[in-house]
Amino acid sequence: MTLDIFDQFTSPTMFGLPLAWLAMLAPSLMLVSQTPKFIKSRYHTLLTPILTSIAKQLFLPMNQQGHKWALICMASMMFILMINLLGLLPYTYTPTTQLSMNMGLAVPLWLATVLIGLQKKPTEALAHLLPEGTPAALIPMLIIIETISLFIRPIALGVRLTANLTAGHLLMQLVSMTTFVMIPVISISIITSLLLLLLTILELAVAVIQAYVFILLLTLYLQENVYVPPSSCMPHG
């Protein structure tokens, strides 16, 4: 039974060839693309205002230079969101339940913010490793702690996404198996079916929220390491 539960997280193969790349390429078919037509599709008309409002909410705290990250961040959010939603379909594979893929997304994006921060503003970037007003005796210890916390950030991004999706898929698997086994008992099967329906709605919300949280934390790291709004750079009186 344990193997059956976790079998949904194994990478699918056909004739010995991995098919995970198909699952990762599938969201590209659902992304909005610009067309030369004057009349936009309903999907484009619905999705564009939503993405625009999310981008404004995430990038308005930054200055004009930080807005160049909007495209890659929104594309990454849509990529994660589509994979999460497609993974809720029956008999499908969810690549975002694999820690290797999530770390492959989190580490390069986080590392880009850190490296650019060290390149553009090395003094401000290194200042985050030592809080202001720290006693001299605690300086070495705090530098080590802040450095460790800095390198834990991409791990937290990947593990958070993996853990939330894996827990939800396992719970849906257990409830669906219980519903199938309890079919002869009508009253219990109805209750478990309603529970499965509510759990599916919850997982839809989790799929959307986790994609948004992933990019939200990335923009916060970007704002901290690279771009600071002009209002916070006012000279002292």
From Swiss-Prot:
Keywords assigned: ATP synthesis, CF(0), Hydrogen ion transport, Ion transport, Membrane, Mitochondrion, Mitochondrion inner membrane, Transmembrane, Transmembrane helix, Transport
Membrane topology type: Multi-pass membrane protein
Positions of transmembrane segments: 12-32, 69-89, 98-118, 137-157, 181-201, 202-222
Pfam family, one: ATP-synt_A
Catalysis performed (reactions): H(+)(in) = H(+)(out)
Main localization (coarse): mitochondrion
GO annotation terms (biological process): proton motive force-driven ATP synthesis; proton transmembrane transport
Record's subcellular location: Mitochondrion inner membrane
Gene Ontology annotations for the cellular component aspect, listed alphabetically: mitochondrial inner membrane; proton-transporting ATP synthase complex
InterPro entries documented for this protein: ATP_synth_F0_asu (IPR000568), ATP_synth_F0_asu_AS (IPR023011), ATP_synth_F0_asu_bact/mt (IPR045083), F0_ATP_A_sf (IPR035908)
Cross-referenced SUPFAM superfamilies: F1F0 ATP synthase subunit A
Entry's Gene Ontology molecular function annotations: proton channel activity; proton-transporting ATP synthase activity, rotational mechanism
Record's function text: Subunit a, of the mitochondrial membrane ATP synthase complex (F(1)F(0) ATP synthase or Complex V) that produces ATP from ADP in the presence of a proton gradient across the membrane which is generated by electron transport complexes of the respiratory chain. ATP synthase complex consist of a soluble F(1) head domain - the catalytic core - and a membrane F(1) domain - the membrane proton channel. These two domains are linked by a central stalk rotating inside the F(1) region and a stationary peripheral stalk.
Recorded family membership: Belongs to the ATPase A chain family.
Subunit structure: Component of the ATP synthase complex composed at least of ATP5F1A/subunit alpha, ATP5F1B/subunit beta, ATP5MC1/subunit c (homooctomer), MT-ATP6/subunit a, MT-ATP8/subunit 8, ATP5ME/subunit e, ATP5MF/subunit f, ATP5MG/subunit g, ATP5MK/subunit k, ATP5MJ/subunit j, ATP5F1C/subunit gamma, ATP5F1D/subunit delta, ATP5F1E/subunit epsilon, ATP5PF/subunit F6, ATP5PB/subunit b, ATP5PD/subunit d, ATP5PO/subunit OSCP.
NCBIfam families, A to Z: ATP_synt_6_or_A (TIGR01131)
UniProt-recorded name of the protein: ATP synthase F(0) complex subunit a
